[in-house]
Swiss-Prot record:
GO terms for molecular function: metal ion binding; pyruvate dehydrogenase (acetyl-transferring) activity. K(+) binds at residues 161-162, 166. Thiamine diphosphate binds at residue 60. This is Pyruvate dehydrogenase E1 component subunit beta. Heterodimer of an alpha and a beta chain. It comes from Chlorokybus atmophyticus. Its cofactor is thiamine diphosphate. Signal peptide: none annotated. Keywords: Chloroplast, Metal-binding, Oxidoreductase, Plastid, Potassium, Pyruvate, Thiamine pyrophosphate. The keyword Metal-binding applies. CDD domains: TPP_PYR_E1-PDHc-beta_like (cd07036). It comes from the Eukaryota. Its EC number is 1.2.4.1. The pyruvate dehydrogenase complex catalyzes the overall conversion of pyruvate to acetyl-CoA and CO(2). It contains multiple copies of three enzymatic components: pyruvate dehydrogenase (E1), dihydrolipoamide acetyltransferase (E2) and lipoamide dehydrogenase (E3).
Length: 335
């Protein structure tokens, strides 16, 4: 068992899968000689060469399309988008080809590929590089969406994604690459469609994913000291949702709060809230609550940037309100 940064866990996953299966190839901007913007592919060009680690121009539409073709004809591409905001330039390829080709070809072509890279709000990266776009891709037929949040699940999930026969959007958070954690040295896989029960509780079900997992954990620590008992679930799979795990928790707590970094309009939480109401209405004591980011571009300056992201104090107050139904008590904590 080694302690690794999250980016190192991703690197290890890719390395192991490239060594195991010669059809796995890497495609993307600056992934070869440079080793990737966040060093996830560092060292792989030297080990596997230019035919398996392919540097591309800054042309997302073209290299995602090339990867779809490669996947349909027998390879297993792992594509790095330097920033998820600019993967939008390849949206037509993702929607019309990556997601739907298997169905539109009557099953003649499969598209076993992974499109991965950083998303979320970083530290003063500016509006264009601070977008949360997972909900943009949720409506693409045939596309799975997976998020990682720890070095342990990053490695296990990415290995599973590479071995899957489905096209997968694998979202990493820019602020989690330097997160440290224990990662087994052995070959292990984690299920792509399974949520993680982070903390058992009985008062309310808190659903979250990616970076907000850690803000939720900090909020729960404060509330536990005050006598509250929230249950915390890391969704991991954003499409499809693990409704079995979610439902089991709701049957116990009867209250729900969804915490996300997406914007409040059209976010992941809107779809999840609807599914919860449709499937578990009779188990709910109140409507599921949503805590999302405001509908504004992310400012560059630090204090304003922070104001556009859900903070720990927001989560504390929302959980308390969800449990008691009363306005939260005044607190001085800001994070």
């Amino acid at each position: 068992m080694a302690v690794r940064f999250l980016f190192e866990a991703l690197q290890k996953a890719i390395d192991e899968e490239m060594e195991r299966e010669k059809r796995v190839v890497l495609i993307g901007e600056d992934i070869g000689h440079y080793g990737g913007s966040y060093k996830v592919t560092q060292g792989l060009y030297g080990k596997y060469g230019k035919h398996r680690v392919i540097d591309t121009p800054i042309a997302e539409y073209s290299f995602v399309g090339a990867a779809v073709g490669a996947a349909a004809t027998g390879l297993i591409p792992v594509v790095e988008g330097m920033n998820m905001a600019f993967i939008l330039l390849a949206y037509s390829q993702i929607s019309n080809n990556m997601g739907m080709l298997c169905a539109t070809s009557g099953g003649h072509f499969q598209v076993p590929m992974v499109l991965r890279g950083p998303g979320g709000i970083g530290k003063q990266l500016g509006a264009e590089h601070s977008q949360r776009l997972e909900s943009y891709f949720q409506s693409v037929p045939g596309l799975q969406i997976v998020t990682c949040s720890t070095p342990y699940n990053a490695k296990g999930l990415l290995k599973s994604a590479i071995r899957s026969k489905n096209p997968i959007l694998f979202i990493e958070h820019v602020l989690l690459y330097n997160l440290k954690g224990e990662v087994p040295d052995n070959d292990y896989l984690l299920p792509l469609e399974k949520a993680e029960l982070v903390r058992e509780g009985s008062d309310i079900t808190v659903l979250t994913y990616s970076r907000q997992r850690y803000n939720v954990i900090q909020a729960v620590k404060v509330l536990v000291e005050e006598g509250y008992d929230p249950e915390v679930i890391d969704l991991i799979s954003l499409k499809p949702f693990d409704m079995e795990t979610i439902g089991k928790s709701i049957q116990k707590t009867h209250k729900v709060l969804i915490v996300e970094e997406c914007m409040m309009t059209g976010g992941i939480s809107n779809v999840l809230q609807s599914l919860i109401i449709d499937n578990f209405f009779d188990a709910l004591d109140a409507a599921p609550l949503i805590l999302s980011s405001p509908n504004v571009p992310t400012p560059y300056t630090g204090p304003l940037e922070e104001a556009t992201v859900v903070q720990t104090i927001d989560i504390i107050e929302s959980i308390e309100y969800g449990i008691t139904g009363k306005p939260p008590k005044p607190r001085t904590a800001k994070k």
